[in-house]
């Protein structure tokens, strides 16, 4: 019985290395396949990350372009409205000049007449509306400023120093700080 057991054991020990070798070979093959799969997965992951990065950069550029176009359109729209207001204001200046002339003539004839008072109220209302929309008259104090005044003649004046404004011949206007029309003035020249 002992011999039989030894034979059986010998028989198993001879088979074990062969099956063990097959199992090891199979495991090595699986390990290689797993390593190849891991490498392929790494390559796929790298490729995916690269493509994702490219697409993300494209998205950021397109988004930035979109925002720039949006801002430019808003600015263009705003400028178009500004230009429209400025154009209307320029078209109104002769009407304002006519009302000022009519008021001046009416006041010279009779300061207390209904016409004079009506023209005065109309001018006040007109200036209120213009001011609400950023249109205002240019002040013509004593100092001459070539940015706001246009000297169209020089006159002798005992009351004013050289270069000072003597008389406003036509009112000037500005729109949101920008000159629409300079004030036409005469300045003192006492040489």
Swiss-Prot record:
Domain of life of the organism encoding this protein: Bacteria
Keywords for the protein's UniProt record, in alphabetical order: Chaperone, Cytoplasm, Stress response
Compartments where found: Cytoplasm
Biased composition (Basic and acidic residues): 1-19
CDD domains with a match to the protein in the record: GrpE
InterPro entries (UniProt xref): GrpE, GrpE_coiled_coil, GrpE_head
Major localisation: cytoplasm
GO BP annotations, alphabetical order: protein folding
Annotated segments matching region Disordered: 1-44
Bilayer-crossing regions: none
GO molecular function, one term: unfolded protein binding
Cellular compartments per GO CC: cytosol
Family per similarity comment: Belongs to the GrpE family.
Self-association and partners: Homodimer.
Annotated NCBIfam families: PRK14140.1 (NF010738), PRK14149.1 (NF010747)
Job of this protein: Participates actively in the response to hyperosmotic and heat shock by preventing the aggregation of stress-denatured proteins, in association with DnaK and GrpE. It is the nucleotide exchange factor for DnaK and may function as a thermosensor. Unfolded proteins bind initially to DnaJ; upon interaction with the DnaJ-bound protein, DnaK hydrolyzes its bound ATP, resulting in the formation of a stable complex. GrpE releases ADP from DnaK; ATP binding to DnaK triggers the release of the substrate protein, thus completing the reaction cycle.
PANTHER family: GRPE PROTEIN, GRPE PROTEIN HOMOLOG, MITOCHONDRIAL
Name listed for the protein in its UniProt record: Protein GrpE
Source organism per UniProt: Helicobacter pylori (strain G27)
């Amino acid at each position: 019985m002992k011999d039989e057991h030894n034979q059986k054991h010998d028989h198993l020990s001879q088979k074990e290395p062969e099956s063990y070798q097959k199992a090891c070979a199979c495991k090595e093959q699986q390990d290689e396949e797993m390593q190849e799969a891991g490498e392929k997965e790494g390559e796929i992951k790298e490729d995916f990350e690269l493509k994702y990065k490219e697409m993300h950069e494209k998205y950021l550029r397109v988004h930035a372009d979109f925002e720039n176009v949006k801002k430019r359109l808003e600015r263009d729209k705003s400028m178009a409205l500004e230009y429209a207001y400025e154009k209307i204001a320029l078209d109104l200046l002769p009407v304002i000049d006519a009302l000022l002339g009519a008021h001046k003539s009416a006041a010279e004839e009779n300061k207390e007449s209904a016409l004079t008072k009506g023209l005065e109220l109309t001018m006040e209302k007109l200036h209120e509306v213009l001011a609400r929309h950023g249109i205002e008259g240019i002040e013509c104090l004593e100092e001459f400023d070539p940015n706001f005044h246009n000297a169209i003649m020089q006159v002798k004046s005992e009351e004013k120093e050289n270069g000072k404004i003597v008389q406003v011949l036509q009112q000037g206007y500005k729109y949101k700080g920008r000159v629409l029309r300079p004030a036409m003035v005469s300045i003192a020249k006492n040489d």
